[in-house]
Amino acid sequence: MATKIFDDALRAKPKQSGLGVFLKPLNSEYGRVAPGWGTTPLMGFFMALFAIFLVIILEIYNSSVLLDGLSISW
């Protein structure tokens, strides 16, 4: 009997939500690759900025950067 209930559950149609209907057009290009480099240089630029940000945070945390007028005491 448990198998019968499980089989019936697999045949049920999925419910559509308002959010799903709204987001479906965003997923219509799934699996397609745009020709050329696309936005790769922009992504690389922001990755470099993020890496610089992380280095600055790390240097402040390690107290290897001395900031004028700001004393950090843990």
From Swiss-Prot:
GO biological process terms on file: photosynthesis; protein stabilization
Topology versus the membrane: Single-pass membrane protein
Subcellular location: Plastid, Chloroplast thylakoid membrane
Record PTM text: Phosphorylation is a light-dependent reaction catalyzed by a membrane-bound kinase; phosphorylation occurs on Thr residue(s) in the N-terminus of the protein.
Gene3D superfamilies linked: Photosystem II reaction center protein H (1.20.5.880)
Pfam families the UniProt entry points to: PsbH
GO cellular component: chloroplast thylakoid membrane; photosystem II
Positions carrying Phosphothreonine: T3
Signal sequence interval, chain numbering: none
GO molecular function: phosphate ion binding
Membrane-spanning segments: 41-61
InterPro entries (UniProt xref): PSII_PsbH, PSII_PsbH_sf
Keywords: Chloroplast, Membrane, Phosphoprotein, Photosynthesis, Photosystem II, Plastid, Thylakoid, Transmembrane, Transmembrane helix
Subunit architecture: PSII is composed of 1 copy each of membrane proteins PsbA, PsbB, PsbC, PsbD, PsbE, PsbF, PsbH, PsbI, PsbJ, PsbK, PsbL, PsbM, PsbT, PsbX, PsbY, PsbZ, Psb30/Ycf12, at least 3 peripheral proteins of the oxygen-evolving complex and a large number of cofactors. It forms dimeric complexes.
Chain's role: One of the components of the core complex of photosystem II (PSII), required for its stability and/or assembly. PSII is a light-driven water:plastoquinone oxidoreductase that uses light energy to abstract electrons from H(2)O, generating O(2) and a proton gradient subsequently used for ATP formation. It consists of a core antenna complex that captures photons, and an electron transfer chain that converts photonic excitation into a charge separation.
PANTHER family reported in the protein's UniProt record: PHOTOSYSTEM II REACTION CENTER PROTEIN H (PTHR34469:SF4)
UniProt record similarity statement: Belongs to the PsbH family.
Name used for this protein in its record: Photosystem II reaction center protein H
Organism of origin: Psilotum nudum
